[in-house]
């Protein structure tokens, strides 16, 4: 293993060893508190442009499952068809894995996909730095190549345009009610969750004008980066809402885009919510749910138009976790009800959406 150094934008340095693809890289450094689910996290398009730090110390223990495509045409064990994180940062990488479904080690997978991975990092201290000072840009440099310095931007980059489909894709064609899914970086399990409820899914590019299509409901998917870079998508949503009261549901980035269409402003969280243990409360009730989350931006609910209200709030910091219209079947969640990985406490969100189609 080659010696590497993680250099944060404030000058803080962490020393470790390379166990993935040997190439310097730069990106926004974030942390995830989940204890498992690294194959799903690495293939989540919402992590595009980021150096992902896993706070759980042991990573790689159960290897990597095979990449297979199910009958529905979506990946069986991954959330997309490739790794989207720019690099993986762990405390203790485990080379010897053990799992009945594993076909290769995490290191082999990273190398095959040309994604750097570093181990031996004090991820506890790194997380404390990010928690106190906020997420920041970072660079992974190889000690024997001090002049090979990568450059990358995160702010002002439209990552949604990079990860969204470029063509219309249909799943479960002819099955029943038709749902247009706006792909901002959709996870495979969102598509699977809709298909399992007997609907046809029409996946369209994030910038596509679907208002003239024949469909029964609109689903706004998750995605990476700053939602303010997706104003073209917001305008199409506004156009759709002015034309019809067809059901609308959104997840993560979808919550932010629908909120922008409802007049709300978006702000960046200090260090985001990334993990499997985020508690949220349904507004107007005493019901609390444990949720899987992955976002760095939030909705300022106080700026919503008068016809809208909060649906969920985060129990840790009070930030918005979903909105709903007071009359029309339009609602969202900032968290991921499809999980994968993570708790499925809020899986009912898909049931609620499909019920509104009938």
Question: What are the residue ranges of the model-derived segments?
Answer:
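RNA-binding accessory domains that recognize and position tRNA/RNA substrates
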Residues: 1-207, 227, 235, 340, ...
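Residue-level detector of beta-strand face positions
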Residues: 5, 279-281, 311, 322
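Proline-centered loop/turn at the N-terminus of a beta-strand
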Residues: 116, 178, 247-249, 265, ...
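Active-site-proximal beta-strand elements of phosphoester/diester hydrolases
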Residues: 178-183, 291-292, 331-335
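Short acidic/histidine-rich motifs immediately flanking catalytic phosphotransfer sites
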Residues: 213-218
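Cysteine-nucleophile active-site neighborhood
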Residues: 222-298, 342-356
